[in-house]
């Protein structure tokens, strides 16, 4: 992350300056790991991160991935204060629409996972959908799954904020 000199030795070398590599660097540095270096052939986010959608959902079908998403959304909110650099995170919530009973069954399964990790969510009726999204056309809709903490971020800004945080913790 520094062009001042080429590092000849490191205990941990992370290859790739996208959001995944920089996130790993940030988290290791924050946990107190020393002698870390990030290796990137171009600029940070010059690979696939720069054109990623930046969606931050928490509705995942598995416990571990849902927990990672929850922690990520919480991090993006804190990271701006920690680094004084914008992440571009916007917590706007989301609705997943149910057109059949099987959709509602899936929502119940996912709600159990989200309840377990402390992520707010609710299965809502068509009347409640209108309160969240007053302009939606309800034809064929039987319910929805509302996750108010979902959002989206600017992947490049988020990566750069994590890079700054990693440097603040001593990473190179």
Predicted feature locations:
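Glycine-rich FAD pyrophosphate-binding loop
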Residues: 29-49
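Conserved donor sugar-nucleotide recognition element shared by glycan-biosynthetic enzymes
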Residues: 48-49, 72, 155
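Helical element adjacent to the flavin cofactor pocket in flavoenzyme catalytic cores
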Residues: 145-172
């Amino acid at each position: 992350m520094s062009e001042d000199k080429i590092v000849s030795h490191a205990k941990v070398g992370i290859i790739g300056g996208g959001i995944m590599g920089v996130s790993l660097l940030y988290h290791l540095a924050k946990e107190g790991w020393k002698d870390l270096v990030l290796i990137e052939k171009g600029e940070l986010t010059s690979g696939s991160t720069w054109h990623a959608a930046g969606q931050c959902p928490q509705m995942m079908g598995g416990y571990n991935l849902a927990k990672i998403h929850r922690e990520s959304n919480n991090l993006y909110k804190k990271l701006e204060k920690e680094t004084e650099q914008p992440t571009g995170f916007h917590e706007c919530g989301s609705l997943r629409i149910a057109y059949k009973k099987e959709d509602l069954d899936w929502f119940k399964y996912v709600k159990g996972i989200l309840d377990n990790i402390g992520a707010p969510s609710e299965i809502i009726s068509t009347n409640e959908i209108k309160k969240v999204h007053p302009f939606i056309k309800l034809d064929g809709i039987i319910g929805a799954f509302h996750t108010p903490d979902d959002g989206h971020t600017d992947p490049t800004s988020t990566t750069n904020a994590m890079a700054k945080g990693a440097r603040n913790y001593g990473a190179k």
